[in-house]
A protein has these predicted regions:
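Non-catalytic, conformational "gating/processing" segments within enzyme and secreted inhibitor domains
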Residues: 67, 74-75, 94, 123-159
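Non-catalytic beta-strand/loop surface segments
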Residues: 4-49, 83-138, 162-207, 218-229
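Short, glycine/charge-rich beta-strand/loop segments that flank catalytic centers
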Residues: 37-40, 71-80
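M16/insulysin-pitrilysin zinc metalloprotease superfamily fold
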Residues: 45-76, 222-223, 227
Length: 229
């Protein structure tokens, strides 16, 4: 009860949705973010003449973050997991299939995380992860539009150049996937339409053949795919 009271007092002091409001008033749209096993990405569409605003906003996001709503946002992620994984007919099976598919590699962990981890994740855990991975040396910016490279470089140095290095090297992934010696098969039943998932280990995403593999996936997957037909 005491903790909840402190959370409510904190919320009373916050400016709600200020980040989104600044972008919207500048004519920006489509602000969102996503996470997968390899990266976290933030994207937004802004008018070309608001390029400096983008550099300022995104560098401020990374410069000195204060996790004011950490616990409420942690609750949001837990609820998202319930909706997307635990409350769908096939969600738990898809998650366990992925965990079975990978023997040793960290890809066996779903990007949203296990509920037991989400419930025990502390602010100190999040800050340690942030200081390690959300560092300038681990950052890539992709800009598309009516802008020049020279202009972008000047603004990048002006704003992102303020962010100090973390001093904590990103640890290498040293656990490599073991060679698969036999077919893995999972059979499950649920209140849903029949579904077949076929998974293969192929090439890393930076490999020259990864683009062809993406096209093959598109050709085979979904109700318009060759396998379905």
């Amino acid at each position: 009860a005491r903790f909840q009271k402190l959370v409510e007092e904190q919320r009373a002091l916050m400016v709600k949705d200020e980040f989104d409001k600044i972008y919207t008033e500048a004519g920006a749209s489509g602000m969102n973010a996503g996470t997968n096993q390899d990266s976290t990405f933030y994207f937004v569409t802004v008018p070309a003449n608001k390029l400096e605003l983008w550099f300022w906003m995104e560098s401020e996001r990374l410069l000195q973050p204060v996790f004011r709503e950490f616990y409420s946002e942690r609750d949001v992620v837990q609820e998202e997991r319930r909706l997307r994984v635990e409350s769908t007919p096939t969600g738990p099976f898809d998650e366990q299939l992925n965990a079975m598919f990978w023997t040793a590699h960290p890809y066996k962990w779903d990007a949203i995380g296990w509920m037991s981890d989400l419930k025990t994740l502390s602010m100190a855990d999040a800050q340690d992860f942030y200081s390690t991975y959300y560092a300038p040396g681990n950052l890539t910016a992709a800009l598309v539009g009516n802008i020049t490279v020279a202009e972008a470089k000047v603004l990048a140095e002006k704003y992102f150049g303020r962010i100090p290095p973390s001093g904590k090297p990103v640890p290498d992934v040293v656990t490599l996937e073991e060679k698969q010696l036999a077919e893995k098969r999972m059979n499950a039943e649920c209140d849903c339409q029949p579904q077949v998932t076929v998974a293969y280990k192929t090439v890393p995403f930076r490999h020259k053949d990864s683009y062809a593999m993406s096209i093959v996936t598109g050709l085979l997957n979904g109700q318009t795919g060759r396998l379905y037909k």
